[in-house]
Amino acid sequence: MSLNFLDFEQPIAELEAKIDSLTAVSRQDEKLDINIDEEVHRLREKSVELTRKIFADLGAWQIAQLARHPQRPYTLDYVRLAFDEFDELAGDRAYADDKAIVGGIARLDGRPVMIIGHQKGRETKEKIRRNFGMPAPEGYRKALRLMQMAERFKMPIITFIDTPGAYPGVGAEERGQSEAIARNLREMSRLGVPVVCTVIGEGGSGGALAIGVGDKVNMLQYSSYSVISPEGCASILWKSADKAPLAAEAMGIIAPRLKELKLIDSIIPEPLGGAHRNPEAMAASLKAQLLADLADLDVLSTEDLKNRRYQRLMSYGYA
C-alpha cells in the first residue's frame, strides 16, 4: 500500500519517492554495476530519522490532520486485527440500520465482548454508505440496543470512537438526533457491565460522546477529541476557517492535554509515523490496553462500577 503524506510530511514524502525510484530501477535491471542497495538503506535510515524528528514536535493542528488520515485504521480494521469470531448485529428495531455505526459480539482473547464503533469508509461508495462516519439517530439507537443486550448477557462493552460528529441533516433532527444522543449518555452511565471507550481517530462532539461514556476512556496518541472541529471553532470565533491551526491549539484537542485535565485515562502510543504506518502493531498495542483495562474493572462489583462512573462524570468541569 502506497502511503498518503500530509503537508507537514512532504520532506519524508520526497525521501520515500527517491527510495521507490531506486527500488524500481534495481528491480528492472539486477545487473547494474552500482550498489543501489546501500543507497536505499542509507535513504531509509534518513527517512526514519526525519520522521522521528518531525513527529517529536507535532502541533495540535498536525495531530488533528493525522486523526483524519484517509489510511488510518477504522473500527472494522481493529476488529479484524485484535478480535476473533466477530458477528455483526444490525438495526435499531425501530427505523433502520445505520451503517455509520457498526457493532456486534466478538471474542477478545477468548472472552465474549460487545463491540460498538463508528465506521467512516474508504472508497467513495463506502463513504457514502457509511455517511462519512456521521451517525443518524438510528445509529445511536442501534448502539444502545447492543449495549443493553451486553448488559443482559453480562458482557463487557468496548467502543471505538471515530467521527467528525453526529449527522446534522434535517431528517436526523426530525427523527430525534439530540434525544438519541442524550438517551445514550444517560443509559451508558447506568450500565452494570464494564465499558471501555477508545478514541481511535476523530472524537467529534456529541456524536463521539454518545458512545463515549465509560469506566475507562483511552485515546490513541494521534487522535483528537473536541466539542467542535478546529475549522468550525475558527469560523465562529474569527469568521475564517483559515484560523483552524490557532483554534486547534487553543481548544486542547490532543491526548496529553485531555489526560492532564483528567478527561481520559490512558494514551496508547502509535507506531512511528502514525497508526496507518503499521496497523498490526497498533492493533497489538490497543489489544494490550483493552485487556489491562478489563482486568482492572473485573474486580469491581456492579454497584462499584456505577458509583465510580457517576463520580467520574460529576468530576468534570469547574465549580
Swiss-Prot record:
GO annotation terms (biological process): fatty acid biosynthetic process; malonyl-CoA biosynthetic process
Catalysed reaction equations from the record: N(6)-carboxybiotinyl-L-lysyl-[protein] + acetyl-CoA = N(6)-biotinyl-L-lysyl-[protein] + malonyl-CoA
PANTHER family, per database record: ACETYL-COENZYME A CARBOXYLASE CARBOXYL TRANSFERASE SUBUNIT ALPHA, ACETYL-COENZYME A CARBOXYLASE CARBOXYL TRANSFERASE SUBUNIT ALPHA, CHLOROPLASTIC
Molecular function, one GO term: acetyl-CoA carboxylase activity
Gene3D superfamilies from the UniProt entry: 2-enoyl-CoA Hydratase, Chain A, domain 1
Keywords: ATP-binding, Cytoplasm, Fatty acid biosynthesis, Fatty acid metabolism, Lipid biosynthesis, Lipid metabolism, Nucleotide-binding, Transferase
UniProt-listed Pfam families: ACCA
Localisation: Cytoplasm
Function: Component of the acetyl coenzyme A carboxylase (ACC) complex. First, biotin carboxylase catalyzes the carboxylation of biotin on its carrier protein (BCCP) and then the CO(2) group is transferred by the carboxyltransferase to acetyl-CoA to form malonyl-CoA.
EC number: 2.1.3.15
Known pathway: Lipid metabolism; malonyl-CoA biosynthesis; malonyl-CoA from acetyl-CoA: step 1/1
Coiled coil: none
A single cellular component GO annotation: acetyl-CoA carboxylase complex
Classification of source organism: Bacteria, Pseudomonadati, Pseudomonadota, Gammaproteobacteria, Enterobacterales
Recorded family membership: Belongs to the AccA family.
Name of the top EC class for this enzyme: transferase
Self-association state and partner proteins as the record states: Acetyl-CoA carboxylase is a heterohexamer composed of biotin carboxyl carrier protein (AccB), biotin carboxylase (AccC) and two subunits each of ACCase subunit alpha (AccA) and ACCase subunit beta (AccD).
Designated name of the protein: Acetyl-coenzyme A carboxylase carboxyl transferase subunit alpha
Residues in CoA carboxyltransferase C-terminal domain copies: 35-296
